[in-house]
Regions:
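N-terminal beta1-alpha1-beta2 submodule of the flavodoxin-like/Rossmannoid cofactor-binding fold
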Residues: 1-97, 102-106, 110-113, 117, ...
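Residues at the starts of beta-strands that form the adenosine-phosphate
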Residues: 3, 38, 136-138, 174
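Cofactor-binding loop segments of dinucleotide-utilizing enzymes, especially the Rossmann-like FAD-
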Residues: 9, 143, 180
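Short histidine/acidic/glycine/proline-rich micro-motifs that form metal-
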Residues: 11-14, 146-147, 184-185
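Glycine-rich phosphate/pyrophosphate-binding loop and the adjoining helix
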Residues: 150-208
Length: 208
């Protein structure tokens, strides 16, 4: 039995969000084809994660070094480590997130900040940082209304690239990826574009 964590970074309803359609398609098919696995869903908007701030920064440093932290620092560090432990304990993780204003939602950025901890997801060496979770299986589901995979908008794509670069820093270099793009740019083909992505998400889920 595998432990699977589904991380959802979009609070729009499915009828308004291609990203959520991908998420629901993947989740439904995964549960149908892997009934023995333990699935946990984490909705980052429902979680209302506090921003990564001075208390969390100092708290994580002090806790990691065995230094006494203030009550506020300890509380912040414990919160971040709760999410980190959940991530580390999962055999597979599925992220679903949109491209908003060229990047990822603030909720996902905050979550990734929680996970980005030296000694846990990466370590420093004389040769440079080395990822520590390269054996984790990852799927990324994303929808973006314009075309960012090529052409003049490609340089502005700081959403999927950001997440992939963060994962690579942790040693995860080959995540499975399903992207839907162009459904707002080409409204006459929007439904076909989205449904193609929904099918690809389901196909990936069946073999993930």
């Amino acid at each position: 039995m595998a432990k699977v964590l589904f991380v959802k970074a979009n609070n729009r309803p499915a009828d308004q969000s291609a990203t959520v359609k991908l998420y629901e398609s993947f989740l439904k098919t995964y549960k149908e084809t892997h009934p023995e696995d333990a699935v946990t869903e984490l909705n980052l908007f429902d979680a209302e994660l506090p921003y990564y701030d001075l208390n969390m920064l100092n708290g994580l440093f002090k806790v990691g070094k065995g230094i006494e932290a203030t009550a506020e620092e300890q509380k912040a560090a414990d919160l971040a480590n709760t999410y980190l432990d959940q991530f580390l304990g999962a055999d597979k993780v599925v992220f679903a997130f949109p491209l908003w204003n060229f990047t990822i939602p603030a909720q996902l950025l905050t979550y990734l900040f929680y996970l980005n901890q030296a000694g846990k997801t990466f370590k420093y060496t004389e040769q440079g940082p080395v990822g520590l979770v390269g054996d984790k299986k990852i799927a990324l589901l994303q929808a973006r209304g314009g075309v960012y995979s090529e052409g003049p908008m490609a340089a502005l794509e700081m959403s999927l690239n950001y997440v992939k670069n963060t994962l690579a820093f942790w040693g995860i270099n080959n995540p499975e990826v399903v992207v839907v793009e162009g459904h707002n740019q080409f409204p006459d083909r929007a439904e076909a574009i989205i449904q193609d992505g929904v099918k690809r998400a389901a196909d990936l889920a069946a073999k993930f």
